[in-house]
Regions:
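Structured-RNA-binding interfaces characteristic of tRNA pseudouridine synthases
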Residues: 1-259
Length: 259
């Protein structure tokens, strides 16, 4: 039995997230159906994370097992003929039998786009969070920096997924403005449910003056979800970089992309 890893990119607007859900369109189900048509048997595709409904991926890693002998270099072209235009497989390669797209991943990066202008731009609909009130990116960076390090992130997660621990390590959280577009890039060894979106909401809260950047440490210590900022809309959030190192496989799937 071969274990095949896939690199994908997709727009999440028309899907209820990655994870298969009964009677709802999801990215995983769509990919599984395409794989089954190519390899000639049903497959289970394991993804690197459960992206929420409406969240996009500039890079995403999944794996599945198959008895098919189709060469890996042909798989992307074959699969893409059976996938909709908003999901694309960019690479396929064989990995060792114990490789797991989520378990072997050691770091993830999400990028959040905020379109900060008084006028909407139709080309950013579902691609960036439209926010008409001016935001000071310097204050946002000061707030974002408070999240860096190893902390209990229970205050910036939504209840919905059971986890053994809410402690995570954030390696960087960078804020950059180019014209009306503000980009937030956050990298961690893992993310809790809605954690990236709640962190972005907290950073915006600080820019609005609703909390002070230096208060974020105490908010994290409190574990109180209501003390942090809101969970922002999903349309501006993208998975953009993944790091793998399980002692055998070591590679990255990444994109330096911003609009």
């Amino acid at each position: 039995m071969r274990n095949i890893a896939l690199f994908l990119t997709y727009l999440g607007t028309d899907y209820h997230g990655w994870q298969v859900q009964k009677n709802l369109p999801t990215v995983a189900e769509t990919v599984e159906k395409a794989c089954a048509m190519i390899v000639g048997h049903s497959v289970h595709v394991t993804g690197c994370g459960r992206t929420d409904a409406g969240v996009h991926a500039r890079c995403y890693v999944a794996n599945f097992r198959t008895t098919s002998t189709i060469p890996c270099e042909r798989l992307p072209y074959a699969l893409n003929t059976h996938l909709p235009q908003d999901i694309v497989v960019t690479k396929a390669f064989e990995v060792h039998e114990n490789f797991n797209a989520i378990g072997s991943c050691v770091r993830k990066e999400y990028t959040h786009q905020i379109y900060n202008s008084r006028l909407k731009d139709p080309f950013y609909v579902n691609r960036a969070w439209f926010y008409p009130k001016h935001l000071d990116e310097k204050i946002m960076q000061e707030a974002a920096s408070q999240f860096v390090g190893t902390h209990d992130f229970a205050a910036v997660r939504s209840v919905g997924t059971d986890v053994k621990s809410t402690v995570r390590t954030v390696y960087y959280y960078n804020v950059e403005r180019k014209g009306d577009l503000i980009t937030l890039k956050v990298c961690a060894n893992g993310f809790l449910y809605n954690m990236a979106r709640a962190m972005a909401g907290t950073v915006v809260y600080a820019a609005e003056g609703k909390i002070k950047p230096e208060e974020i440490g105490k908010i994290l210590e409190s574990g109180n979800r209501t003390a942090a900022g809101p969970t922002v809309p999903p349309g501006g959030l993208y998975m953009t970089h993944l790091w793998y190192d399980d002692g055998i496989e070591k590679f990255e799937c990444g994109s330096d992309w911003t609009e």
